[in-house]
Design a protein with these regions (language model features):
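N-terminal, post-signal peptide beta-strand-biased segments of exported outer-membrane/organellar beta-barrel
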Residues: 20-145, 150
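Gram-negative bacterial Sec-dependent N-terminal signal peptides
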Residues: 2-24
Length: 436
């Protein structure tokens, strides 16, 4: 059996078990592919609709003005320690036993096989004058397979030895969420006789659309052969009576609400620029637990018989560990400081330092980031970008380009990130007017 197929099936099955939970530094998605193209190193240079989520002060700087992005989208996916590139090596062929053994050793050493998938969509991002408006939806799902579950996927219930063995699924996790944010940004120019300077503020209103947190237990017993699994899950659901049991009413997309404030500063003197921003200076977002349910789902399969249960219950019955996980899913403050130099009229280099003030909370980006980027505009209709950064426990590198056809821009970027969030591949595409 092909291991890459089994692993994919396992990830899909876990996703189906319940919506997931990961984490984000700012609730508005990055609408600009330029930001990813320079690896996020544009706090001092960002303009137009890209400034709304990065540094709102850029809206009052020269080069902003009108800009419009048409449904820009960013996707991300990753596996760790067995990576997407590891699986790609065996696309369409059987994975040798020795390779599966090595993979399982890596998973055992890491403690789990982690997977992540997500998408950020900006329904619109618009700037005019010193004002910016954006609405975006962020969806993220991650899971962790413990070594026992990974062994079952790679080798079946016989295990790696070929003889039936007890395999534990304890430690299986599936976390996911979706939220939508509307943001209003204002850039405020500051008077100066020697440079261009501005302050900026963004006010965000976030709605939690869906949430799911699940923790797995049980496993496979060898003698007698038996599959006994449990899944304690909290998820978006209003519990209703349904026949002899309970069920869920239609999903309420207003599963949590909150308001956040971001601040920014930017200065440009001759060829040198400075920028700083703090996202979530204040953020009141929290999930509405009245719109969550708990299920102690279980399934038992023995020779000739089976039994399962998955009826939802009131959230109040959830274990304390799941309630704590829900309470922790909030937005934490993040600071970004950047500098840039226009080496020439067509070439700009920039550097950034980012740090989130907490290890907890929603985190789609690394806690720490120190990097540099560059943009070259000397090819007329083609603008090129690249960047790299040292991040928490790893590195990130990226590249991108824009095809500039008068006011119309077609922009794309890609990045690879390794670190505390595993190995993640990111891609971004945007059709825009007036900015990139």
């Amino acid at each position: 059996m092909r291991s890459e197929f089994l692993l994919s099936v396992a990830l899909v099955a876990l996703n189906a078990a319940g919506p997931m939970t990961t984490a984000a530094s700012a609730q508005l998605a990055n609408a600009s592919a330029s930001t990813l193209g320079v690896s996020g190193n544009n706090t001092a240079t960002v303009r137009g609709f890209g400034a709304i989520s990065v540094n709102p002060a850029g809206l009052a700087m020269p080069g902003s003005g009108f800009s419009l992005a048409i449904v820009p989208i960013q996707v991300r996916a990753g596996l760790d320690p067995i990576t997407l590139s590891d699986l790609a090596e065996f696309d369409g062929v059987l994975v040798p036993t020795a390779t599966k053994e090595a993979w399982l050793d890596e998973i055992t050493a890491a403690g789990a096989q982690a997977g992540l998938v997500g998408v950020d969509i900006s329904e619109f991002a618009l700037t005019f004058g010193n004002i910016g408006l954006q609405m975006s939806t962020v969806i993220s799902i991650d899971e962790n397979l413990p070594p026992g579950a990974a062994e079952a996927i790679l080798f079946g219930n016989a295990g790696r030895t070929g003889s039936a063995a007890n395999l534990s699924f304890d430690g299986t996790t599936v976390d996911g969420f979706a939220f939508t944010t509307a943001g209003l940004s204002v850039g405020i120019p500051l008077e100066s006789s020697t440079s261009d300077m501005a302050l900026g503020v963004t006010v965000n209103y976030t709605v939690g659309n869906a949430l799911g947190i699940a923790r797995g237990t049980g496993g496979i017993l060898a003698d007698p052969v038996e599959l006994d699994v449990g899944l304690a899950a909290v998820f978006s659901c209003e519990v209703i009576s349904e026949g002899d049991g309970t069920g869920c009413d239609d999903l309420d997309p207003m599963g949590g609400t909150g308001v956040g404030f971001d601040l920014g500063f930017m200065m440009k003197q001759d060829r040198f620029s400075l920028g700083a921003s703090v996202s979530n200076v204040v953020n009141t977002f929290e999930w509405d637990t009245d719109k969550l349910a708990y299920t102690p789902a279980s399934a038992e399969f023995k020779l000739g018989e089976s039994e399962s249960s998955a009826d939802p219950e009131a959230y109040s019955g959830a274990p304390a560990s799941l309630k704590t996980a829900v309470a922790d899913l909030t937005f934490k403050p993040t600071i970004q400081i950047g500098a840039a130099l226009d080496v020439s009229n067509d070439f700009t280099v920039s550097g950034d330092l980012h740090n989130r003030f907490s290890d907890d909370g929603i985190r789609l980006s690394p806690k720490f980031h120190l990097g540099a980027g560059a943009e070259f505009r000397g090819l007329g209709i083609l603008h090129l970008r690249g960047g790299a950064a040292v991040i928490t426990d790893g590195i990130q590198y990226s590249g991108g380009a824009s095809l500039v056809l008068g006011p119309v821009n077609l922009s794309a970027a890609a990045a690879v990130r390794t670190g505390d969030l595993g190995e993640v591949v990111l891609g971004h595409f945007a059709l825009s007017f007036g900015n990139r």
